[in-house]
Amino acid sequence: MNFPTIPHESNVVSINVGGRIFQTTKQTLSLAGTDSLLSQLATETTRFVDRDPDLFSVLLYILRTGNLPARSRAFDVRDLIDESRYYGIESFLIDSLSNSSQFEPFDLRRSRILQLNGRDSPSSISPTVIGGGLHVAHGSKITSFDWSLRQKSTVLTNFSAVDSLLEISPGVLAAGATDFPGLQIIDLDNGGFVRTTLNWENVTRSSSTVQAIGSSHEFLFTSFESSRRNSNSIMVYDLSSLLPVSEIDHCEIYGADIDSAIPSTKLKWIQSCNLLMVSGSHTSPSGVNGHIRFWDVRSRNMVWEIKEAQDCFSDVTVSDNLSAVFKVGVTSGEVFYADLRSLGTKDPWVCLGEEKKRNLNERRGVGSKIESYGNHVFCSSKGSGIELWSEVITGLVGNASRDVLEERVFRKNSLGKLADSGENKITGLAFGGNRMFVTRKDQQSVQVWQSPSRGISI
């Protein structure tokens, strides 16, 4: 018996863009979404688009892989933006720029300077949740740059100066100051409208100022200090409803107890351990003292505490990927690490620098900043340059498998100019997507660092 032949509809689609033929599949075009031009081309019989074929090839590659091709650096970002909007796939271009896999720390170069309006230098910076954009607090103003860093908008706040800033959802910021009560939730899409103000009611019922802000996927953390500076605490809020969940690290000052007088000025969530790292320090004529505490937010129990006295931290951060805490000593200016598995020991710190040359009579690390991103740690110690610290895997035991605790090996590389270059001291480091943002003392701008081998021309 002979069966009739059913014509097979080919899954391959040919598109003529500016005289050049491109072949792809209907599944690839459907990824663009039903409202996009590419999705419509998958169902049409005549597929001709009078646009630039070179730009189309870049966008088609992004649609297929989710990443920017190496050849994209030959194009101006404005052309790619316009073309992606024409095809209705701008969100794919944004996602490719915010992909942290495109971040190449060993090839970072200064690619752009973001100028700010007014005379105030940046006091706090916060990368956008998605897209590689940036929010900058300078004086009483907050300036926001979109993902392309070419469009900016500025809103005026109620603060005389914004000291803490964090984007908690697209277009919504949490902002606070050390001299103005309350944590304000600011809606940028409504011209800087303050949705609500979160406060901590202390024992003396005085107003409370914000010392630091942090967040996880579920919670918003805020470090408060009473205006009389005799009590401090960390409030935990639900990130979606902004309702209070719990209170941790509550301290009341009694007599000359210096430790309880130190509010936490940095909050870092450790996703792998479900712990919140809080840190704060105090400078007195006798030296610098501080604390680093690790809190289980759900049980409201403090898991570990490191008390800092000799060579206390100037700044501290934690790396989930490296399972370690890093600090830069305020006295020595050297970088130290503490393995998260050894935090129960008396002295968990291991010096990564030249420990033999440490001079505890100097304060070489004052004002130094340290942050982690991916598998790397960035430090602004000893001048205006940036140190990049990366772990060297020496074998399967300990470092690679993380099963056996042993001393780990880190290697230092230098980015930018050295201390004698004449550049101003670094005051802030932040990371988003494939970009590093740097602020410097007395400069009304933000430096953007990016890899020229991966990034498009901005």
UniProtKB/Swiss-Prot annotation:
SMART domains for the chain: BTB
Going by the UniProt record, its keywords in alphabetical order are: Repeat, Ubl conjugation pathway, WD repeat
Note the segments forming the WD repeats: 259-305, 360-399, 421-458
Family matches, as SUPFAM superfamilies: POZ domain, WD40 repeat-like
Pathway assignment = Protein modification; protein ubiquitination
- Any single biological process term in GO: protein ubiquitination
Record flagged with keyword Repeat: yes
- Which residue ranges does the record assign to the BTB domain? 11-72
Q: Which Pfam families match?
A: Beta_prop_At2g24240 (PF25279), BTB_2 (PF02214)
**Top-rank lineage group of the source organism:** Eukaryota
**UniProt-listed CDD domains:** BTB_POZ_KCTD-like
InterPro entries from the UniProt entry = BACURD1-3, BTB/POZ_dom, SKP1/BTB/POZ_sf, T1-type_BTB, WD40/YVTN_repeat-like_dom_sf, WD40_repeat_dom_sf
Family annotation (PANTHER family): BTB/POZ DOMAIN-CONTAINING ADAPTER FOR CUL3-MEDIATED RHOA DEGRADATION PROTEIN FAMILY MEMBER (PTHR11145), PROTEIN BINDING PROTEIN (PTHR11145:SF23)
Q: What does this protein do?
A: May act as a substrate-specific adapter of an E3 ubiquitin-protein ligase complex (CUL3-RBX1-BTB) which mediates the ubiquitination and subsequent proteasomal degradation of target proteins.
**Annotated domain remarks:** The BTB/POZ domain mediates the interaction with some component of ubiquitin ligase complexes.
Name the record gives this protein: BTB/POZ domain-containing protein At5g41330
